Each structure stands twice: as structure tokens, then as C-alpha cells.
């Protein structure tokens, strides 16, 4: 059984830093995918694309699960200098596509232009895409 849980969190424009505490209460997901969307598109403006995941020049992203930072070194992209390969590579790590002969249909050059998603595998053995069961963390 696979469950998809979508969380929506609003970050006001112009905010320089944002810390979100206790985003998940109860059972932790196996995987967390983070994307940023313009609020006008999210709220239904038909001139905007709600699937345009822009980077908004963010320059630091990481998660903490039980006081453990994921990934161990935060993602620090610099989109103005085209230095975002670790963020792009998180799509492969976080979706279980690393070290496989499979892709995700998002090229490195397309990533900052509407496909800026970051994925994190939250399982203890980094097996969110495998078929075996993991201990459920609460």
C-alpha cells in the first residue's frame, strides 16, 4: 500500500530564511520531495502554470529528522552561477534511481527552468524505492 501525502506551506515573498518545525506529526514518510510554486499559480491563476517548480534563487536546503540532518551536507545551490548539481542529483538519490539504468526525464539544463525539485530518502537504509518493508518511524 502506497500513500501520498501532500503538504502545502506558504512562504511569503521576500523572506530570507524559513525554518519549518514539525511538518510531519506521526508516521514519517519514506521519501520527501520539495518544490516551490508561485502562489498565484497555486491559487488558480490560469495565466500561471502550477507545475512550474521554480528555484526562486534559494541557496540552502536540508531536512532534520530526529535531530539528524538529511543530507549530511546541506544542498547549497547557486543558480546565478549554474552550480546546482547536488540539488539536481538529489532527484536520483531521493527517488531510488541512483546507480540504476533509469532516468527521471529531467535534464540538468532543464532543472532550473521549472523542474527544480529536491528529493530526500528518509529510510534508514536508503531503500525508499525497494520492495522490502522498513520499520515505521513515528
Residue ranges and their predicted role:
Residues 1-138:
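Flexible assembly/topogenesis modules
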